[in-house]
Regions:
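Juxta-kinase regulatory segment immediately upstream of eukaryotic protein kinase catalytic domains
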Residues: 1-20, 209, 213
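ATP-binding glycine-rich loop module of kinase domains
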Residues: 19-61, 68
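Active-site beta-strand termini and strand-to-loop segments that position acidic
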Residues: 32-37, 91-92, 141
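Conserved structural core of kinase catalytic domains
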Residues: 56, 68-113
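AlphaC helix (C-helix) of the protein kinase catalytic domain N-lobe
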Residues: 63, 67-70, 119, 180
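Short C-lobe core helix of eukaryotic-like protein kinase catalytic domains
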Residues: 114-124
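Catalytic-loop of the protein kinase fold
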Residues: 124-140
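C-lobe/activation-segment region of protein kinase-like
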Residues: 141-216
Length: 216
């Protein structure tokens, strides 16, 4: 099935028994949709609040752009495009969030090595996620393979990007790597290996937050 036909079929199934709501938040809604024998994840912008509606739609469009840059990168769900209503259609990852798997994965060097390679590969393509500390933004499939999801606030750096955007990208890049350290070492920063210290450089905001608000 071509993407155009797929997007049309999925759009028609939203709101029917073939569409199962799995999450709803201020920013968006997630649906699991089955069509043509396959299961897809559909992300819709939450338009219930008029003042959040344009922001949420921008987030979906930004995420669509990011998935285009990361196309064919192993560990990134496939993106099939946007429906006519602006819904984002993605590959459905049959697994659990890192939040649900964190204790099972404690000490699993293979998983964290794979996750680090994925993050670095993402950065090399000019994408910084910026919110990987949030455990729900990491998915783990049945083979314990990591996936990165939810790129709504990610930033894309192009060669023509200006100084400010490149500076923001560098900060978010550090934040992504610091998030990897946080998940691998469970906030035990004094136990970071000498090799992994190369990936750890807390930002001023993170230092302030950890010292005066809570341990990140």
């Amino acid at each position: 099935m071509e993407n155009r036909d797929l997007l049309k079929a999925i759009s028609e199934k939203l709101g029917t028994p073939s569409s199962v709501p799995i999450f709803e938040g201020n920013q968006g809604k997630l649906f699991k949709v089955k069509t043509d024998g396959n299961i897809y994840l559909v992300k819709s912008a939450n338009a219930s609040n008029w003042w959040l509606k344009p922001i949420n739609r921008w987030s979906i469009e930004n995420e669509h752009k990011v998935y285009g840059v990361l196309r064919n990168l192993d560990g990134i769900p496939k993106c099939y495009g946007l429906t006519n209503n602006g819904d984002l259609v993605l590959e459905y990852i049959d697994g659990k969030s890192y939040r649900d798997m964190q204790f099972e994965l404690d000490g699993n060097d293979h998983f964290f090595d794979s996750l680090l390679k994925l993050i670095i590969a993402m950065h090399n393509k000019g994408i910084a996620h910026g919110d990987l500390k949030r455990k729900d933004n990491l998915m783990v499939d049945k083979d314990l393979k990591p996936y990165l999801v939810d790129f709504g606030t990610a930033i894309v750096k192009y060669d023509r990007s200006g100084f400010i955007k490149k500076m923001v990208f560098d900060v978010l890049k550090k934040t992504d790597l610091n998030a990897w350290i946080k998940h691998k070492y469970k906030r035990s920063y004094d136990k970071i290996s000498s090799e992994d210290l190369n990936y750890y450089s807390p930002t001023s905001i993170e230092k302030f937050y950890r010292k005066f608000i809570k341990r990140i």
